[in-house]
């Protein structure tokens, strides 16, 4: 950066010019010191999550400052050239400082984004579903008098919102009852009635996972079709349980999909969690080894399995085998059997839940990718047709974007 500084043969200079050089050099050192001091103060105030990047910025600035100091000490005594070179040095330092400050500001912005509360991220994640429903409901809640035409419009919106026929019929009956009971008159009041009806429908799905106090590992087996987000959900769950003070071990039981093991190992490395895997062998063997390794030292085992369609009968038999092997490893295991659902598939999610529930006896669901779909009504369809508890929902790609399902928060963000 400062390659333009070169030593020159010393020449005699009048005393006045020599004093100007020294004064200029001292001024540069003072300004540089002030710049560095300001940067260090900014860096020290950063959150822990940007500490590394901030320290890198300080090192960059400090290196530049040292070069300036060395150059000042070796400056030629020729006043004119000295002043010119000092100005160039100041510009170079200012540029370096500007770049460093930019890095710090970018890091701070990233930190602030991750500090968004869950309610804000949930609202942001449900934007597509909410926007679609809001446009469709604009005519319904526009202030017109409640009548059969309005009811027909509302029914159409609910069906096209992937709530399914059974859930739609339930909601329409419930809304009509509330309108009659409370004497509601217009579309604006109808919104509140719909929100309460939808909340009552999906509230039974809100059953947070409670971990028992036991000496044996709590085993959670995850299943689902390819692409639903099982492996990613396992990585996020590991982080979630660690935040609760639990020790976690991962079983790379997806022995079919290319790079599935490597993907889970990457999540394990990210969370500092051990991953049990095999280069050969079947899913059941991997899961069994993981449970054996976890005994007496690990709180939770998260067992990944290969993606499969419910219509692939031989693969459904294989996942039943995984369950049986886990039962042999620890009586009562797996303690939780969760299917991971991609919200983008809409009504097909109900069929998947039915098939996996019939085969395995599901205890919970994880609904992912709600941020990428306009089909947020799928939870109403599940609540009406096969009400397996929704343990967690995912509304983003961040590691903290998987949280326990909250029915009230979901309805409020969907229909606000």
Swiss-Prot record:
Pfam families named in the record: SRP54, SRP54_N
Primary location group: membrane
Gene Ontology terms: biological process: SRP-dependent cotranslational protein targeting to membrane
Organism: Neisseria gonorrhoeae
Gene name, Swiss-Prot/TrEMBL: ftsY
Cofactors, names only: Mg(2+)
Feature: compositional bias, Basic residues: 1-10
Keyword Transferase: no
NCBIfam families noted in UniProt: ftsY (TIGR00064)
Subunit structure: Part of the signal recognition particle protein translocation system, which is composed of SRP and FtsY. SRP is a ribonucleoprotein composed of Ffh and a 4.5S RNA molecule.
Designated name of the protein: Signal recognition particle receptor FtsY
Record's bilayer topology term: Peripheral membrane protein
GO cellular component: cytoplasm; plasma membrane
UniProt catalytic activity: GTP + H2O = GDP + phosphate + H(+)
SUPFAM superfamilies in the cross-refs: Apolipoprotein A-I, Domain of the SRP/SRP receptor G-proteins, P-loop containing nucleoside triphosphate hydrolases
Family of this protein: Belongs to the GTP-binding SRP family. FtsY subfamily.
């Amino acid at each position: 950066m400062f390659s333009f500084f070169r030593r020159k043969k010393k020449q005699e200079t009048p005393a006045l010019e020599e004093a100007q050089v020294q004064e200029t050099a001292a001024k540069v050192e003072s300004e540089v010191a002030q710049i560095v001091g300001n940067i260090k103060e900014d860096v020290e105030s950063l959150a822990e999550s940007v500490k590394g990047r901030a320290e890198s910025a300080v090192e960059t600035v400090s290196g530049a400052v040292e070069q300036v100091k060395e150059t000042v000490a070796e400056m030629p005594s020729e006043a004119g050239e000295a002043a010119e070179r000092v100005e160039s040095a100041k510009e170079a330092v200012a540029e370096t400082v500007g770049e460093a400050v930019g890095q710090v500001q970018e890091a701070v912005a990233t930190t602030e984004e991750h500090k968004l509360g869950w309610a804000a991220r949930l609202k942001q994640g449900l934007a597509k579903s909410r926007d679609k429903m809001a446009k469709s409901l604009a005519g319904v809640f526009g202030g017109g008098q409640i009548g059969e035409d309005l009811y027909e419009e509302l029914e159409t919106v609910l069906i096209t919102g992937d709530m399914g026929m059974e859930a739609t019929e339930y909601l329409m009956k419930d809304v009509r009852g509330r309108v009659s009971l409370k004497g509601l008159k217009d579309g604006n009041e109808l919104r509140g009635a719909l929100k309460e009806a939808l909340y009552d429908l999906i509230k039974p799905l809100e059953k947070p996972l409670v971990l028992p106090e036991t000496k044996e590992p709590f085993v959670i087996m995850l299943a689902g079709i390819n692409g639903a987000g099982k492996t990613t959900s396992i990585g996020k769950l590991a982080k979630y349980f660690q935040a609760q003070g639990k020790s976690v071990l991962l079983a790379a039981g997806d022995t079919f999909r290319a790079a599935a093991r490597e993907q889970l190992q990457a999540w394990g490395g990210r969370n500092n969690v051990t991953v049990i895997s095999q280069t050969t062998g079947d899913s059941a063997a991997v899961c069994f080894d993981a449970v054996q390794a976890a005994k007496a030292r690990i709180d939770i085992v998260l067992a990944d399995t290969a993606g499969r369609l419910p219509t692939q009968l031989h693969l459904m038999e294989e996942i039943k085998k995984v369950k049986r092997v886990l039962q042999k490893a620890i009586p009562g295991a797996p303690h939780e059997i969760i299917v991971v659902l991609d919200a983008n598939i809409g009504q097909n999610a109900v069929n998947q839940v039915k098939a996996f529930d019939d085969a395995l006896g599901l205890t919970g669901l994880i609904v992912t990718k709600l941020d990428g779909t306009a089909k947020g009504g799928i939870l109403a369809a599940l609540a009406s047709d096969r009400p397996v508890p929704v343990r967690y929902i995912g509304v983003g790609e961040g590691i903290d974007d998987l949280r326990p399902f909250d029915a009230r928060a979901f309805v409020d963000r969907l229909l606000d």
